[in-house]
């Protein structure tokens, strides 16, 4: 864990952010959006030969409310893009996205009017995995890149509870008459 400092026998100090990021990075819950042939390679990644369980991402969640990583695998049409975006919006923060394969990254070989030429037109993509279809070890490498990105996050855990948008707003009176109205209580 980054940010750790030893303090002698049996003591270890760290920050709350470092321990939170360590937990998030080692317990990723992916949600597969298998739309094409890349989904077959994604299923192979979860099998015993590649063993994605080593990286804490063995449990695929098919509910967006229980996942924090969306793996979009395959061709996305404009009609399907609205569905993918709605599912993305249902995922809790923090969340990450992997564009798996040439079709989800850039439209692939389907350069026609109904196909979205890259899901980065409507989703923030964290890692692109090249290939048609990409091998399972390439997807595992992408999961490892997501883990490193999570570990490097700098946003403060405490600041998320004290965001300026949530702070109580105090309005100051503008005129003496308005000040009287605010001080009189009946």
UniProtKB/Swiss-Prot annotation:
Enzyme class per UniProt: translocase
GO molecular function: 4 iron, 4 sulfur cluster binding; iron ion binding; NADH dehydrogenase (ubiquinone) activity; NADH:ubiquinone reductase (non-electrogenic) activity; quinone binding
Any GO BP annotation: aerobic respiration
Reaction catalysed by this enzyme: a quinone + NADH + 5 H(+)(in) = a quinol + NAD(+) + 4 H(+)(out)
Membrane topology: Peripheral membrane protein
Family to which the UniProt record says this protein belongs: Belongs to the complex I 20 kDa subunit family.
Name used for this protein in its record: NADH-quinone oxidoreductase subunit B 1
Known cofactor(s): [4Fe-4S] cluster
Native species: Chloroherpeton thalassium (strain ATCC 35110 / GB-78)
UniProt KW Cell division keyword: no
Taxonomic path: Bacteria, Pseudomonadati, Chlorobiota, Chlorobiia, Chlorobiales
Catalytic activity, EC: 7.1.1.-
UniProt-annotated location(s): Cell inner membrane
Pfam family, one: Oxidored_q6
SUPFAM superfamilies per record: HydA/Nqo6-like
A cellular-component GO term for this protein: respiratory chain complex I
